[in-house]
Amino acid sequence: MAEFTPITIAYGDGIGPEIMEAVLYILRKAEARIRLETIEVGEKLYKKHYTSGISEESWESIQRTGIILKAPITTPQGGGYKSLNVTIRKTLQLFANIRPSVSFHPFTMTLHPHLNLTIIRENEEDLYAGIEYRQTHNMYESIKLISHTGCEKIIRYAFEYAVKNNRKKVTCLSKDNIMKFSDGVFHKIFNEIAKEYPQINNEHYIIDIGTARLATKPEIFDVIVTSNLYGDIISDVAAEISGSVGLAGSANIGQHYAMFEAVHGSAPDIAGKDIANPSGLLNAAIMMLVHIGQGDIASLIENAWKKTIEDGVHTADIYNEQNSSKKVGTKEFAEEVTKRLGQIPTKLPKADYPLIAEKQESNIDYKIDTNEVKKLVGTDIFVNMNISSAHDIADKINKLDLGNIELKTISSKGLKLWPRDTRFETISDHWCCRFMNKDGTEIKHLDITRLLEALSKANIDFIKVENLFEFDGVAGYSLAQGE
């Protein structure tokens, strides 16, 4: 008797329920060997005051099955709500987001008939950590977190993906010409890991020109690996230029869990109209079937779907007079796919997936390297003062008895404003005051607490402390522009 794999199903919001029903209909007709558990997430949960959009009962189902097929959800705009997608990815440590983009020319309209690439996006870190603060009346902060281990995991995954899927090249996208620490370590680790895969070509682009090339010459790319925010943006670009965002599915992979979803959003403006294209979620379900070792069913469905596309049976988003023969709605599209189960596409590539479940490499022990000597050499204290001249702030601080510690620089938004030859004025209430020992020696935490006490007694409103470290004698902090 065939073994059935338990799967957690989330119907989502907007067009989610109708495209999920269409996909489940196809899975049933194809006799996928899965057992479904349904959970409620998203908008209904937000309205019940679950700020993350998911309940404990839903988490229990996910922990039981380890696999989620999720339709798009709607995250309410404004404060107080967390993105459910980000919550699930981080909680389940789904570090890799895999987003294939393929042209189905000539059956869908695209300017790039040879587009066939996969974007591997880091899923847990970067600005999507969601750590934000309002520090003053004028200034807001969002923290970009990038770890050495996080970079190593996603970059190694990208090269392993290239090897397993017969890809020839991996391209890294970063902005390390500006963000020399966070994006710099991503690029550095990419170069190091690339040496372990001499059979795979590698290259690097700055994200801006890389995105421009992706939009105009996508056929030059094969596998792209990048950090969270950049990956989110460029995967939508790639999906759009392939012919329709509605065709793209994605996988979120971790060591113990996996989630599969469409790239597109919940599109509440067309919800309930039976016009949404279920192909994105269907392609995500195909990726899920491959992941759990049901490559036979995945191939059966993908070939039927491709034959449907070849036959010109299209939903409104990809329908065109030149290549389409019939415009159908969500339900009818699913029915047309099932009519073609067992058929093979004649022009698009035939799918033939293995019957082996995908497993994450477990022999790599990702550890935090603590061999570098870490030395505390200073501190940046951010202060809230509604004043136009950094010289006035310096005058006030320099009157204080700070012992061996001295004020080195004052900057605002990364620009050094003191000491300068001219009294440059700026509109700011957010100032970074950099302190170090006069003799350049190591400082102690007690020195910093005494410094904060002195600032407090002088009624200087400090809002943040960022300590400055050297690692093996190399500065672990950036200099302000002009410093």
From Swiss-Prot:
Homodimer. The record marks Y128, K175 as: Critical for catalysis. Its EC number is 1.1.1.42. Binds 1 Mg(2+) or Mn(2+) ion per subunit. One of its GO terms (molecular function) is isocitrate dehydrogenase (NADP+) activity. GO terms for biological process: glyoxylate cycle; isocitrate metabolic process; tricarboxylic acid cycle. D-threo-isocitrate binds at S83, N85, R89, R99, R121. It is an enzyme of class 1 (oxidoreductase). This is Isocitrate dehydrogenase [NADP]. It catalyses: D-threo-isocitrate + NADP(+) = 2-oxoglutarate + CO2 + NADPH. Mg(2+) binds at D232. Pfam families: Iso_dh, Isocitrate_DH_C_bact. NADP(+) binds at T74, H264, G265, S266, A267, P268, D269, I270, N277. SMART domains: Iso_dh (SM01329). It comes from the Bacteria. NCBIfam families: ICDH_alpha (TIGR02924), PRK09222.1 (NF006673). Catalyzes the oxidative decarboxylation of isocitrate to 2-oxoglutarate and carbon dioxide with the concomitant reduction of NADP(+). Keywords: Glyoxylate bypass, Magnesium, Manganese, Metal-binding, NADP, Oxidoreductase, Tricarboxylic acid cycle. PROSITE patterns: IDH_IMDH. Belongs to the isocitrate and isopropylmalate dehydrogenases family. It comes from Rickettsia felis (strain ATCC VR-1525 / URRWXCal2). Its cofactor is Mg(2+); Mn(2+).
